[in-house]
Amino acid sequence: MTIEKSVQGGIEILRLSGWLDTQSCPQLEAEISLLGENVCTLVLDCSGLEYISSGGLRLIVAAYKQMKGALMLRHVSDEIMGVIRMTGLDRRLNFE
């Protein structure tokens, strides 16, 4: 997986490409742990995300809790959205 990072004001955007699975979760977890105190919103741009595992979903939920709900998923594919809906997380997470 590759992660491209950009900051716009207090919004940090992480553009994810590839697979978010057990092997790549530590990479995203490390990026999230580096968020500064001045970041008020985290946006995960999923436009390049091809696959997400249960471990990836757990990491997103953990980030949602860390950000106290100020996490937004952007450009989620129909396939990934289907997985999110299957778990019921579509009613908990924020989408753009």
Language model feature labels by segment:
Residues M1-R15:
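Short beta-strand/loop segment at the start of cytosolic alpha/beta domains
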Residues L20-R92:
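Amphipathic alpha-helical interaction surfaces in cytosolic regulatory modules
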Residues N94-E96:
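Short acidic-hydrophobic, aromatic-tinged amphipathic segments that line or gate anion-handling sites
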